[in-house]
Design a protein with these regions (language model features):
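Conserved glycine-rich cofactor-binding loop
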Residues: 14-16
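Rossmann-fold cofactor-recognition segment
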Residues: 49-64
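Substrate-binding pocket helix/loop in short-chain dehydrogenase/reductase
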Residues: 66, 90-91, 98-103, 192, ...
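Conserved mid-core segment of classical short-chain dehydrogenase/reductases
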Residues: 81-100, 182
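Catalytic loop of short-chain dehydrogenase/reductase
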Residues: 99-103, 107, 111-112, 126-164, ...
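Short, small/polar-rich loop/turn modules that mediate ligand/substrate recognition or access, typified
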Residues: 165-167, 225-226
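Catalytic Tyr-x(3-8)-Lys segment
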Residues: 189-210
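C-terminal substrate-recognition "lid" of short-chain dehydrogenase/reductases
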Residues: 204-231, 236
């Protein structure tokens, strides 16, 4: 098993791509720590993971909470940070507090995770951030998230140099079928997925397991650092 004897921290590991990553890592022998704000979601996620898993509550928008998380976790091998909030809407209509909250979650949250997690990473370890394809192919209504994703990719490149030999990369998913869309009306969700599927060379929406595979690849490949891996069904080509 590739990750036997290693500890992996997944912030945002209670659902979606984070949960898929945690499951896959445990299946490959890792001891996993999943962290998120909701204790209830953490308990449900832990029940789905067959193997060594610990849960920790954290608010990635609070520096003291992130610092406390890594004080509890101690030394580990790999960190990934898929959990965050987003802000969508027309640029001229989107209020500043909403935009700032999204930055606090997706950019500053990952920044804090790297800041307090990096000193605990064992030799040969890595950090894998989460960005998104709108950094490369923005659409109307996604100006804030496009800017955040670009900032995350830039942070990964900069920290790959500054934190070396810790490897730092980013995964940039396309549209993936996760619980984030659960609040949408079923017919609206189906229409959106159909439209996106028709626009990408792969001809379909992504699956959480496919993003998890990309994350584990970046963890295990010792010669990949400072890279952004686009897992988007070819969306960046159109």
């Amino acid at each position: 098993m590739r990750f036997e004897g290693e500890k992996i921290v997944v912030i945002g590991g209670s659902s979606g791509m984070g949960l898929a990553t945690a499951k896959m890592a445990v299946a490959e022998g890792a001891a996993v720590v999943i962290a998120s704000r909701s204790e209830e979601k953490l308990k449900k996620a832990a029940a789905q993971i067959k193997g060594s898993v610990q849960t920790q509550k954290v608010n990635i928008m609070e520096e003291s909470s992130v610092r406390a998380l890594f004080d509890k976790v101690g030394e580990f091998n790999h960190l990934t940070t898929p959990g965050s909030e987003a802000a969508m809407g027309p640029f001229l209509d989107l209020d500043l507090p909403t935009a700032r909250k999204a930055f606090d979650s997706k950019f500053w949250g990952q920044y804090l995770a790297a800041k307090f997690g990096a000193p605990r990473i064992r030799p040969g370890g890595s950090i894998t951030f989460f960005a998104g394809i709108w950094s490369q192919r923005p659409v109307p209504g996604a100006s804030v998230i496009a800017a955040i994703n670009s900032a995350v990719e830039g942070l990964a490149r900069a920290l790959a140099i500054e934190l070396a030999p810790i490897r730092v990369n980013a995964v940039s998913p396309g549209i993936v079928d996760t619980p984030i869309y659960a609040a949408m009306a079923p017919d609206r969700k189906e229409a959106m997925f159909k439209e996106v599927s028709a626009s990408v060379p792969a001809g379909r929406i992504g699956k959480p397991d496919e993003i998890a595979q990309a994350v584990l690849y970046l963890m295990r490949n010792g010669y990949t650092t400072g890279s952004t891996l686009y897992v988007d069904g070819g969306r960046t080509l159109r």
